[in-house]
């Protein structure tokens, strides 16, 4: 009789290992399925579900980064970047009350840095 939490923790560790080996596509696929399973079994706010969602966000970030730095067209990497933004925004919104405000401030700050970088000679 296998305990679901232990099984989910092991699956998460395996997906993290795949991500570290840059097997991003397989890791993202596994994490997407694992997220559905953990949310259904443990609930949306459970620590394991949150950890899976955070790792999935990282997988999408890595996918966007790898595609962008390898010269892929924006239409290829942009969906991964957008999914990353959505996941981390969801995590921020479902954290403590001040987390969303902190997230919004960080986004504005990073956006300003990007604008300043592009304008520098």
Model-derived regions, located:
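Inter-repeat boundary and helix-capping residues of tandem alpha-helical solenoids
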Residues: 1-4, 46, 50-53, 81
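Short coil/turn segments at secondary-structure boundaries
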Residues: 2, 15-22, 44
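"A position-specific structural signal for the A-helix of alpha-solenoid helical repeats
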Residues: 6-9, 13, 20, 48, ...
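Short, charged, low-complexity loops and linkers
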Residues: 9-15, 37-43
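Short coil/linker segments at helix-helix boundaries
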Residues: 20, 24-41, 61-106
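Alpha-helix capping and helix-coil boundary motifs
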Residues: 45, 70-73, 117-121
